[in-house]
């Protein structure tokens, strides 16, 4: 098949989505690995000590989830890749776009909770970046990245729930389980 040149609008759209992919990839890899590890760990706990030693499916799942972090890069490497999107305001800008998207009336409470969390996240980012202290930023980097990730994922779940009731319960459980920042 013959490729055609992109129109200026298509190039601009491609550039926008390439930037989003660059920003969201470390969030997806880091948070996905952490969620997998936590779920596998919880699975093993129901079996007590034998969950580590016997041939339960959770033993394999635990090994697989641990190795995922190695294949994808450790969570700390993902934080290093993501922190620049925190400090440049890229995540906050995207969060603000999500805040302005309409949601189903029954999900407005979740959206408001996420808006409140985003406001506190923005205050934390401002306080830490204005300190101009690299050690402080390094110390807080993982927390800031996780805050952004939870808010973004919450908004994405609320958007999905607005489009289909199939996702409403998941959005409720996820957003309401977040510690209110």
Where are these regions (language model features)?
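Alpha-helix capping/hinge segments and adjacent helical runs
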Residues: 15-99, 172-176
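C-terminal helix-coil-helix/basic helical segment that borders enzyme active sites and/or dimer interfaces
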Residues: 1-29, 125-139, 158, 162
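Long, amphipathic alpha-helical stalk/connector segments used for oligomerization, subunit docking
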Residues: 86, 92-135
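Long, polar/charge-rich, low-hydrophobicity segments
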Residues: 48, 119, 126, 169-172
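Short, glycine/acidic-rich hinge or "gate" loops at secondary-structure transitions
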Residues: 1-9, 44-55, 167
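Extended, well-ordered alpha-helical segments in internal regulatory regions
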Residues: 146-165
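Charged, amphipathic alpha-helical oligomerization/scaffolding segments
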Residues: 27, 31-38, 113-116, 120-123, ...
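Conserved small/polar residues in nucleotide/adenosyl-binding loops
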Residues: 179-181
């Amino acid at each position: 098949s013959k490729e055609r040149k992109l129109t200026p609008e298509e190039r601009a759209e491609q550039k926008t989505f390439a930037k989003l992919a660059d920003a969201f990839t470390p969030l997806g890899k880091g948070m996905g690995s952490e969620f997998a590890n936590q779920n596998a760990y919880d699975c093993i706990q129901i079996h007590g000590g034998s969950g580590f030693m016997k041939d339960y499916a959770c033993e394999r799942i635990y090994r697989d989830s641990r190795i995922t972090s190695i294949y994808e890069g450790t969570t700390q490497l993902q934080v290093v890749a993501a922190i620049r999107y925190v400090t440049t305001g890229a995540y906050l800008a995207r969060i603000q776009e999500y805040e302005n998207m309409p949601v189903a009336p029954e999900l407005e409470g979740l959206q408001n909770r996420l808006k409140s969390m985003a406001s506190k996240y923005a205050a934390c980012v401002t306080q830490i970046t204005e300190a101009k202290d690299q050690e402080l930023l390094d110390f807080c980097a993982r927390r800031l990245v996780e805050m952004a990730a939870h808010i973004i994922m919450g908004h994405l779940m609320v958007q999905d729930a607005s489009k289909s009731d199939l996702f409403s319960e998941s959005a409720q459980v996820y957003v309401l389980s977040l510690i209110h920042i």
